[in-house]
Amino acid sequence: MVEILRFIPLVLLLTLTWRITYELFFSPLRHIPGSLLARLSSKYSILKRVLSDGPQSVQADYQYYGNIYVHRPNGVSISHPDDIRTVLLSPEFRKTKVYEMLDIEGHASIFTTRDPAQASRRRRQIGPYLNHGYLGRMEGLIMKYSVLAIKRKWDRLLEESGGQQVTVNYRDHKQYATFDTIGALAFGREFNALTNDDRTVIRWIEATGLYLGIRKNFPLLKLWPFSRVLRQYRERYERFIAYSKESVTRRKNLLSTVGERPMDLLQAFIDAEDPENPHVKMTADEVMTESIAMQLAGSESTSFVTSWVIHLLTLYPQHLAKVTEEIRSQFSPSHLITFAECRDKLPYLEACVYETLRYSPITSGFLPRISYTKGLTIQGHYIPPGVEIAINLHGAHINKDVWTNPHLYDPTRFLGDDQAKRNVFAFSYGHRNCIGRNLAMMEIMIIIANILKEYDIALPEDSVHGPWNVDALGRPRIMPTRSALFTTPKYPERDCRLVVSRRQ
């Protein structure tokens, strides 16, 4: 036994030597730029994003290596919008197994399925309920839990402060509102997070994403005693699963006693049928999975985008003034602005949202795709079948071949330029774009429009980040972030404060 153990270092050394030799001289990706460590281990890229500033890390990779580089063994990252469209529009490319980590109790959602047939079937089932027409029928419910809830909260705080002004944490309030909204839509229940400043359900949802992600990337933590590290996250995950199952059961019991069906996403999921295979509906587990997926994917991303719009507008007061004037010149203070009115009458606001999606670090990761049957030539390099192709969103959004002065925050680049909008991939692209895109844009637009219509906003005098705090390029510094499933403010209690007063 001792003799065998003496050979272990030699075996490890020979294995490492072979891996390095293969990656540098024999791999089909050997001519593509990239770090040697990235070629040797997939954990290198993950740890680099988690331990450092994730968005800046992947931006730096694009700036150093260019439009294509190796970011993991048998995997490349691409950043040119034309290449990205080629991959996303090809039926040969599908999501990779990494999406398994967000499956719920073994069930893939429309956001995580790797099966093209299942993805198409689910789109046929629930896609009609997420178009502008059906969302318009749910807009009253969406308004109730987002715009009107924030208004009630801020008006109460202003009244308690004597009616002058009040400092709020806009990140918390936007997050509470979007979680309450998706909770009402996808579960048919009231979280009351914003009303009560209650983070209970939000902690369940945050723990769910964290628990599923860590289990996938660090499987050793599934085993005892290491599993104790994740115990609190597992318990919150299990509470969320139980809550979700209970929501489906409650709704089905309700339907047996009342005739009128509620107008929300939970009911849509229950009623959804595949037009190519009528009368086949989703099972209770599938309804639960889609409801949870909508909460995971929809609440966090929407609240973060909304918060980043506010953050960037306060850093660039000239754009805040323009978008506020656009809104107030067309709507009276008492008018509740709808999503249709936002789309028709507020092009500058829409431009600010698109520029936020391009400029801000909403996610620190990639969108990985793979084809097992089709090779592809990208930037002069042939990528054989079986190689993962990951879309570097940050590289695409600052790509010097596409954007003029990409390092600058400039919403005007989107005014009257539909091609610029097509070069933003925050919601993916084409027939495979995020199915919740319309809902997310509705929430973002109506919240920002109605807030700026009714309230004056400004930064507190002691804010660390503002127009005065600039970097070497003269740009206002954005608040520091931390990376998880999404990129969140690192110090929200310090950096997400806003002075709110009634419109003058």
Curated annotation (Swiss-Prot):
Keywords: Heme, Iron, Metal-binding, Monooxygenase, Oxidoreductase, Signal. It comes from the Eukaryota. Its cofactor is heme. Residues 1-23 form the signal peptide. Its EC number is 1.-.-.-. Heme binds at C434. It is an enzyme of class 1 (oxidoreductase). Induction: Expression is under the control of the secondary metabolism regulator laeA. GO terms for molecular function: heme binding; iron ion binding; monooxygenase activity; oxidoreductase activity, acting on paired donors, with incorporation or reduction of molecular oxygen. It holds the Pfam family p450. GO terms for biological process: helvolic acid biosynthetic process; secondary metabolic process. InterPro entries: Cyt_P450, Cyt_P450_CS, Cyt_P450_E_grp-I, Cyt_P450_sf, Cytochrome_P450_monoxygenase. Transmembrane segments: none annotated. Pathway: Mycotoxin biosynthesis. PANTHER family: CYTOCHROME P450 (PTHR24305), CYTOCHROME P450 MONOOXYGENASE APDB-RELATED (PTHR24305:SF235). Belongs to the cytochrome P450 family. Cytochrome P450 monooxygenase; part of the gene cluster that mediates the biosynthesis of helvolic acid, an antibacterial nortriterpenoid. Protostadienol synthase helA cyclizes (3S)-oxidosqualene to (17Z)-protosta-17(20),24-dien-3-beta-ol (protostadienol). The synthesis of protostadienol is followed by several steps of monooxygenation, dehydrogenation, and acyl transfer to yield the final helvolic acid. This is Cytochrome P450 monooxygenase helB4. It comes from Aspergillus fumigatus (strain ATCC MYA-4609 / CBS 101355 / FGSC A1100 / Af293). The gene is helB4.
